[in-house]
Amino acid sequence: MYCVQCEQTMVTPMGNGCSFGQGMCGKTAETSDLQDLLIACLHSLSAWALKAREHGIINHDADNFAPRAFFATLTNVNFDSNRIVGYAQQAIIYRNELIKAISEVEPNPELNHPLAYIELKGISIDQLAEQAKEFALDTDRAEIGEEVHGVRLLALYGLKGAAAYLEHAYVLGKFDNDLYVEYHGFMAWLGTKPRDLNELLEKSLAIGSMNFKVMAMLDAGETETFGNPVPATVNIRPVKGKCILISGHDLKDLKELLEQTEGKGINVYTHGEMLPAHGYPELKKYKHLVGNYGSGWQNQQKEFARFPGAIVMTSNCLIDPNVGDYADRIFTCNIVGWPGVVHLEKHNFAPVIEKALECDGFPYTELEHYITVGFGRKTLIDASDAVIDLVKAGKLSHVFVIGGCDGDKEERHYYTDLAYALPKDTAVLTLGCGKYRFNKLDFGTIDGGLPRLLDAGQCNDTYSAIMLAVTLSQKLGIGLNELPLSIVLSWFEQKAIIVLLTLLALGVKNVYSGPSKPAFLNDNVMNLLHEKFGLSGLTTPEQDFGHIINK
């Protein structure tokens, strides 16, 4: 096992990365290795998908499958070895279908790619786990050096994050052939194990540029399907009655669940990154969508254990449900998986509803406590003139974008301390589950109007923050980096990595990121990123605030 992709990975004097029987996330060495094998198969599939396009051959099923299966290898998504093997087998099936289709117009096609003809050596988990060792991500690390190895992983992990957003968009009916060509190009290239550091950096930024278009496509899918988010208050206290909790990012799953539970006397609660759903008109109209439950994903073992109903995981982040003894009432769907947990197919939530009706539900309604969400792209852009007026009047001095992923580390209290200590003439724009570090605090308003805390949505809604910045830049006639706006990211996994690459690709400088540096990037690479982009780690809220304001 060698896995170094998330912020909680092991960091020791002997080396970085999880490399024993189980990762810090709970993923077994077997599953981790099989994910490496799956990725190798996906490199092969992408290489042939590009070859097929040379002949005008497009297999949309293969295109859709490729990023979805890659998504399954993100942190806290799929821990089920059998499912991972199934994805690898399907990747080879699609690859062979492409070869067959190409053969009809180009007899005996050849492809110069190291993984072009990879085959699975067996069908058993043991056989494939043994084969998987050939494709560990650190096989040539000693030969190529830490810098090249690290930036190659930066590109790979960034592409994983983009793959997740491609899948989220596809679920909402959004597909762009040109973006899939770009995706396959990057995936096939990474399968060649590139070694040129400058090329790796350039391609990493190119992946970020691609992801900006992916996020725009996802934004269109969400707003066309559910309407533009509008500011809305959300109750974060339990309501008496039977209940279902839904977590993850897939708003379509939530819509299906709400439709199937309507009139059944079951209250539905969002969790984690589902919180922004309460701002979408086509979701908030359901009266039995009663509120949001819990906090960041890392607290789910305690919070899910206390939740007296059924639980649905639609995407990351899932952790071991056996610890809190709720494995019999948690369900997975889409690319999520845990061994022994019931997996739902085709949006059939009947087992979830049945389990919810069996459970006790909340015995009484607690005193309501509301927070506000719904500051999506349109709302933010519509408010841009008001923001400019406040800046010109000296009533708004700075906007801080504070968000990203949450996690376990004690150091993450930094984000709470920073947000709470900011002067009253500043505003905080937040997104992702990092918001749970401070979104229950009362930040008040500026000049009695603009809320000081603006929840823009999920991690992919970084797009909304970017579009606000672009709008302000255009209206003020200044560059993005001249705006009184600073970004402080909290990273944990690969979606945060692609968000960072997207910002860097757009030319955004002086981003702060933490709570710690990625374990796959050494100090030389971090210094390079600081020199080129002004990327900085975190110190203390007071010191970083001083640096930001005085720049």
UniProtKB/Swiss-Prot annotation:
Signal sequence annotation = none
Q: Which cofactor does it need?
A: [2Fe-2S] cluster; hybrid [4Fe-2O-2S] cluster
- Reported EC number(s) for this entry are 1.7.99.1
Q: Which UniProt keywords apply?
A: 2Fe-2S, Cytoplasm, Iron, Iron-sulfur, Metal-binding, Oxidoreductase
Pfam families from the UniProt entry: Prismane
* One Gene Ontology CC term in the entry: cytoplasm
From the Swiss-Prot or TrEMBL record, give the protein name: Hydroxylamine reductase
